[in-house]
Amino acid sequence: MRIATYNVEWFDALFDRNANPLIDQKWSSRYNVTRADQWHAVGQVMRAIDADCILVVEAPNHKTGRSTVDMLERFADEFGLRAAQAALGFTNDTQQELAFLYHPHRCSIRHVPMSAPDFPRFDGTYAIDLDVDAVTDPINFSKPPFEAELVCHDGRRITLIGAHLKSKAPHGAKSKDEAMLISIANRRKQLAQALWIRGRVDQVLDEGAEEIVLGD
């Protein structure tokens, strides 16, 4: 079983508002790269990886009139990928989804969100004291991790957590001091998100299950 992860920068920009591929000589959202060149380059990489299961980070945006699953499966069909079926976790508002492509004759994947008293579902809110002031701070994911159950063709089950954590740039800062404060706050938030995932990992391992965390 070959499992991979691939962050496809601005994959969303390779499809129009009706989910049709944009394979032309206009510029992609990548610097100095046409949409056709990016489309074919990503396809060549995925064919070379030849994975049974691929976590696609920054998968095309899922919204009214556009299905992430349909767009990924159309892409997989275009390049004859073995990982030809797609599964989507929680959607988000960033235009960058987390999704899996998988080989249906080798495995199956389904979204199975988990929860625990101290570590809620990833689309919920995690309470933690970030700045050691004895006051809990609410933490959310802009891109909730994708918790999935991978079932191999031989019946083996593995829990997958696909994640995309970011420590955002200090947008809106008006001075170096303000930029420093915002950067520190963002780093603390990223650390809290990592602790949230770590808590889920421990929960799964304590149950005796196998687990893989992958992504950015």
For every predicted segment, state its role:
Residues M1-L98, A173:
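N-terminal, active-site-proximal structural segment of metallo-dependent hydrolase catalytic domains
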Residues M1-V33, W39, G43, H103-G215:
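Active-site regions of metal-assisted phosphoester/phosphodiester hydrolases
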